[in-house]
Amino acid sequence: MIDLKNISLNFILSTGRTGSTLLSSMLNMHPEILSVSEEPFAYNLYPKYKNVTNWTDDTIEQFCYDFYLFSEGKLEPQFGKKDDIVKLLKEHQSVLTGEYAIKLAYFAFFPNKDKSQVTTIVDKELKFHHFLNEVADFYPTSKFIILSRDPRDNVLIKIKRAIKKKRVPSTIFLAKTWNYEYTKLIQKTSTLNKNRCLKVKYEDLVEKPAEVLKTITTFLNLPYNDVMLHYDENIKEEVKRNETAIGDTVKQHLSLFHEGLTQKVNTSKVDIWKKELTEAQNNKIWTICKETSTQFGYNSDGCKTISYFKIRMFKDILRFYFDKIIIPNVYYSLPYGLKYAIKKIKYGKNLKNGTWATKDFYKTTLPSK
């Protein structure tokens, strides 16, 4: 049995396109670390199961149902299958609590990884700025790694991603998103014990990876291991090993947006804003993000604070407030029962008759066997 009492649960907090997948992949190479990505069941399932002590077979089945119901669509290719969770839960059925069940769910990820030495879970999340205080209360011993990236590079990478997906990018929308999410992270982590939080810059991670990884493992009370620097070799092996099992959409997604994971860590994507964004774009981004970005150690580097608002930007600004602030804040402030009902109405019909379908954008069904 897994020593669940001594398994620590920790989190990487960031916005998208910050190198968080790179950091998670590096950490996942460590024999004592299990690092998974962007499935926030630790937040979604805790309220319902926190006080459950009598774990019957029906309770286990319901837990698995809820796990899929709340899926964020990021299960493939990192997750195993439903039976993996069921097996883990039944092996520990006599000692289960809500927190233990959630920890065990992590062990169903990366089925090819040897987890015999795992003592530390590191969960990479992009939405915790909405409810970080609740998560910190749910797991009072958890630690938080806040990963940042220069907002100008972050916006540029997101612009490129939007173009690849044949969307029309908005510099204002993306800059305001970076600024809002990191402002919330600063505000909420400031209320926590400083020993629970560690700031890491993407630029430092790729420039001096060994040094940064040593800082992180020390923060997590773990020994440093050089194997973390060889993440690219492991990812190549995993993709090759699972070539027939991984869907075409996943392969395309990995090729488009995570191609760097199959390369050695390098600084080729640092300060690319200086060459690929216009002066006007850089000044807009810096004007919006200046106050927050300086708290993460970024400087103007020639950018100026300007008056940038134009009437034509109103639509993008309005969309930002609705998409990134109003709608999420309304949803996450709802009572748990109402959020659960919304998920059931929207996705519940896909989880009937043992098909365990999910809104996972990589695939349409997750077989029960």
Regions found by a protein language model. Give the residues of each.
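Catalytic donor-sugar/metal-binding loop of nucleotide-sugar-dependent glycosyltransferases
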Residues: 31-35, 143
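ATP-binding Walker
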Residues: 17-18
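The Walker A (P-loop) glycine that initiates the GxxxxGKT/S ATP-binding motif of P-loop NTPases
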Residues: 13-14, 124
